[in-house]
């Protein structure tokens, strides 16, 4: 029998018979590992313990201690277990697909009756019975004709369609536990009992079109979440409860920040309070960019399709663009314009005006650019996913040798901005060259090394995401962590030699010849709308004083104090504090409650005692008790707190 060489993570290699499975490899190392093994990585591919290995490879055996692989398998197995439970409870239900998603999985079903909360309870109960039965998981490979015949005999038309889309010469993998089977790429655990029975929960039912196409049949999608332990599940459910309390849509209404309506789907109506947050954040970012050497520009929102065709975006983004047809005078045909879905091609147009020298580089062009993208109605979610948004967009035109320095400076700027906004921790992911790409390996080596060196230079932690870069260059993604532990991907840094080439950007080098600049796409917030939503939820509406839309309410206790209330408001406003008077004929406790719901950071209560002593009674949001202090002292303190940082 032919032999193959398997290399382990420690660098040691061993000879094995060709066709050996990872399960057999694990057992050959130790009885203990053979029992604990759940899957393997073979040349970087997640591999089922039952699959044969036919050639030399690098191998790593995974156990439940390997978080990423364990959770993927648990969630994948639960998708199958749920589908089996549904078909055992309601045999007429047809199954479709059930992938792993963030924190869990979903599965789409074709059923005439709507799944109810009681149905979800019954499904969960049956799932736990399947898990406790410890049914063995087995797998076979079939040819396409056999799989089609199998599913046609069972009336599983969705599965037939999936199989028909697979090339005729490709083997199809089938998985079983008990008498139930499904078409699946795998991998899976070895028996259903390896899934923790007390660490999952079915969450909700939603509508979903087959293959995401609204012209197809609408199915029912059941979502579930799963973790390795009961405690992790409880922590996640607690986080969801906290998230519901912090929902920016709920707080946005209470704080009178914004609204959305059917006549303008995905477009935000900013109210005075919300617009104040927006403008303050914009002023802050403008100041930070100016100090970092960026030049602010403004480019058109409506641009002819010719530019999008030249940039390559027409082919890739046309379906997500808002198009406008215009009949120009004396023109033979209508002009087709698009509301810009991104700013980068327009920034190249600004760069291209006038001859550039290497001495002009790096050139950093920034824009708070208004963009529009068509998002499906089902994907929109408050401020987090909209159709009209503004990016804190900037593009750096530079030489290859300048990439590392520009990247390091950007990471330091991003880190400082996030800290100012209350986010002390973030993750960096470096996405490297994909299989299909342009450019030489030497060029990719240089830019990937430049990004990695930049990260190391600033002392930041990072992970490498192999093969996930764009076809033209590597990128960095930045995920911040909010107050309840959620991750939000906001910042990006993308190296792009492609767009300058497509749109003719050039500079004169030291050698007197023309060269193409690199274009570095970068953003810190991502979009103002989404980031404001994140801020609202991170702070549960209790924004930092400098960012709060209504910073101070000066509330009278008696009407005789009204003139002094007006004086206090005027003194605060003169020092740049956003202050309002509340002289309504209401009890002070009522006023305090109302403004606390509106998340006003500071309430100054004014009665006759304060008038006579020229003091104010200070109440801070979320704190019990009050502090009495001289007016001048309080004005000075609040004026300092109101200053925009940076």
Curated annotation (Swiss-Prot):
One of its GO terms (cellular component) is cytoplasm. Binds 1 zinc ion per subunit. It is found in: Cytoplasm. Gene3D superfamilies: 3.10.20.30, 3.30.54.20, Anticodon-binding domain (3.40.50.800), Bira Bifunctional Protein, Domain 2 (3.30.930.10), Threonyl-trna Synthetase, Chain A, domain 2 (3.30.980.10). Its cofactor is Zn(2+). It comes from the Bacteria. The keyword Aminoacyl-tRNA synthetase applies. Residues 1-63 form the TGS domain. It is an enzyme of class 6 (ligase). The keyword tRNA-binding applies. Belongs to the class-II aminoacyl-tRNA synthetase family. This is Threonine--tRNA ligase. It comes from Cereibacter sphaeroides (strain ATCC 17025 / ATH 2.4.3) (Rhodobacter sphaeroides).
